[in-house]
Amino acid sequence: MKNIVLTGFMGTGKTTVGKKVATTLHFNFIDTDKLVEKMAGMSVAEIFEKHGEEYFRKLEKAAVIKASRLKNHVIATGGGVVLNPSNIVQLRKNGVIILLKARPEVILRNISKTKDRPLLAVEDPEKRIRELLEEREPFYRFADYTIDVSDKTIEEVAEEVIRAYIKLKGR
């Protein structure tokens, strides 16, 4: 079976929804950021701090290659995976790519519960979210299906992901 690839900006629920979908479909779950952390032996925030974004993106590309070779997985990608077109090519080979998107204020509310968001360690995080969303918008167009999660529960999003996957997996 093809993989389900969840992509989108940080704080859109990729990991939470991905785990729920994986459980429902009896798939395995993998998070590319967690794979990067395992490869580096440190957190994403530490990688950014000690080695910079470019080094992180190299590790991320290796994680994407590894994850894309799997079968029957729900793959939650890091928010910036889309910035490298070769990542999309890899993930599409054996996956249906579903974009989870949300309004900036929803993203800010969701990520304010967590720390270790190196790209948002700025004075005005909502403004930075808007800038990054605008910058990434062209890259998000590659998705096979898009879900606006802003006003939906985790369960509703998971159900929509499953419906989209069933519809698109045979193409």
From Swiss-Prot:
Subcellular location per the Swiss-Prot or TrEMBL entry: Cytoplasm
Residues the entry annotates as binding ATP: 11-16, 117
Principal location class: cytoplasm
Source organism, top-level taxon: Bacteria
Cofactor binding, per record: Binds 1 Mg(2+) ion per subunit.
Keyword annotations: Amino-acid biosynthesis, Aromatic amino acid biosynthesis, ATP-binding, Cytoplasm, Kinase, Magnesium, Metal-binding, Nucleotide-binding, Transferase
GO biological processes: amino acid biosynthetic process; aromatic amino acid family biosynthetic process; chorismate biosynthetic process
Molecular function via GO: ATP binding; magnesium ion binding; shikimate kinase activity
Signal sequence annotation: none
Chain positions recorded as Mg(2+) binding sites: 15
Biological or metabolic pathway of the protein: Metabolic intermediate biosynthesis; chorismate biosynthesis; chorismate from D-erythrose 4-phosphate and phosphoenolpyruvate: step 5/7
Binding locations of substrate: 33, 57, 79, 136
Pfam families: SKI
Requisite cofactors: Mg(2+)
Reaction catalysis annotation: shikimate + ATP = 3-phosphoshikimate + ADP + H(+)
Enzyme category, top tier: transferase
Entry's EC annotation: 2.7.1.71
GO cellular component, one term: cytosol
Function field: Catalyzes the specific phosphorylation of the 3-hydroxyl group of shikimic acid using ATP as a cosubstrate.
Assembly notes: Monomer.
Family: Belongs to the shikimate kinase family.
Protein name (record): Shikimate kinase
